[in-house]
Amino acid sequence: MNMKKFVCLILAIVCLFSLASCSLINKPDTPDEPDVPTLEAHKCESICDKCQKCLDAECSESVCAEKCQGHEPVSATYSFKVMSFNLDQAYGSDSTKRNRILDKILSEIPDLLGVQEETTAWADYLEETLKSEGYVRVGEFRSTSTSHAYYSYREASAIYYNVDRFELVDSGTFWLSPTPDVEGSVAGGWHSAALFPRVCTWVVLKDKLSGLEFAYFNSHFSYEHETLRNESAKLIISRIEELGIPAFFSGDLNFASNEETDTYAAITAVMDDSRTASPETMNGNTFHNYGYAAGESYGDGKCKTVPIDYIFATKGDFDAISFKILSETGDKGDVSDYYSDHFAIVANYQLTVVYER
């Protein structure tokens, strides 16, 4: 080997050592088990599943997009289960009823639960028992008054949400009246038939899986007069539109969609009814007054042929998958045969997120 080749070889070796040293110096410390947030990791794996890259500690949407160029955008689908349940305010202290209703709720394991006629007895029981199952309660009672013997003024339309899945961003309760932010206000300004304060409870939640920020409203409309229900619907829809984010709305609304078309139209102008939007659905009454069939008269009333309990979702935001009525059978008028005078309802939705690059 002549001297010139020898010098070139030495220089090449020196350069290689220099490059290796720079690489070691500039290489960031990588922990053995990188602490990647669950949501970020989920997005990253969804985006980069096809090319099997972007699995390091620096994983992020932008990095994924750069490393996975040439691959089609990847979508992820997330499920939401919403349950609405009128508890019947008269039985909050009945241990048999309470246990049956708790079993019914836990058999579905909803992500979101809206209840109506939740008295203090019901709230004390459900808040404590559902807390151990991972649910948090939000809701105010419609009044602090206890002056009415039967229709307790201390009644709420509370919301329970899965705390492992959702992060609370904001919440509140307003009254179904011309003065919605006045606590305990009655809707006499809408119609003189109004007897009691009525409330709507709402939450804004952030889904820890999809990252979606959305709202959920839950209420119990007046049975006294159509005008009260119509004005209540318009008020709630206006609050949903003010937020400007995807939303669910559930409740015992005390009207049939085939009878009070104006009230139903006020809601469905903005939201889809899960019963009619779902490919898998059920029909029939949800208020049965302990065993009366759809269309059958009882006392001074008559059961509707369609639900008066509803779950809605804002148009174009969620795909309704299924709607079901959790019906029971028993002897007509036998309170002990049924968990409530209403059947609970459940709607399943899907949200599809496309991660663009």
PLM feature spans:
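Active-site beta-strand/loop signature of hydrolases that rely on acidic residues for catalysis
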Residues: F80-L87, I101-E127, Y160, V203, ...
